[in-house]
Amino acid sequence: MAIIVNNVGAGERLMYRVLLVDDEQIERMALAKKIDRYYGDKVNIYQAVNGREAVAMCSTHNNDIIIMDISMPEMNGVMAAKYIRRIDDKCSIIFLSAYDDFEYARNAIKVKALDYLLKPCDINDLLAVMDMAIQKLDKENAVKENTATDGKGNI
């Protein structure tokens, strides 16, 4: 993990782990580039080509945000999310899908997805949802930090 010296406020983290899951390499790479351009050194971006690979990656590393396609070979996004939730119930899952059928959105809600965006997705919509996920993480980290100390940084 890279060490970055930065002026970071209490409860704010330097790096967030983002997992992109899509069987379409061109879409995955384009999305990674756009996210990297927006967040820069605040994110580490990892990639998986299908749901099965995403589950395997989640079993070895915690991810802060998972951006996942619904329709993929080997294991679809909803099924992968069910397995991922058994491993990590706190990560934010954002689905990107070409399916506008309500049933897909309902299934996304069942696995506690943060959002369900339709492809082609406006990058500003995705970044807004990612910002919400990061704010949620920062609040959770601040609570953990204050719980571990007396609120003034003392243990």
Where in the sequence are the language-model features?
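Conserved Asp/Asn-Gly motif in the active-site loop of CheY-like receiver
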Residues: A48-R52
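Non-catalytic signal-transmission and effector/linker regions of two-component phosphorelay proteins
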Residues: M1-R17
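Two-component/phosphorelay signaling modules centered on CheY-like receiver
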Residues: Q25-Y46
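C-terminal output/effector regions of signal-responsive regulators
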Residues: T149-I155
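Conserved acidic segment of CheY-like receiver
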Residues: Y16-E27, L31-A32, I66
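CheY-like receiver
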Residues: V55-T147
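Switch/coupling loops of ABC transporter nucleotide-binding domains
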Residues: Y16, V43, C91
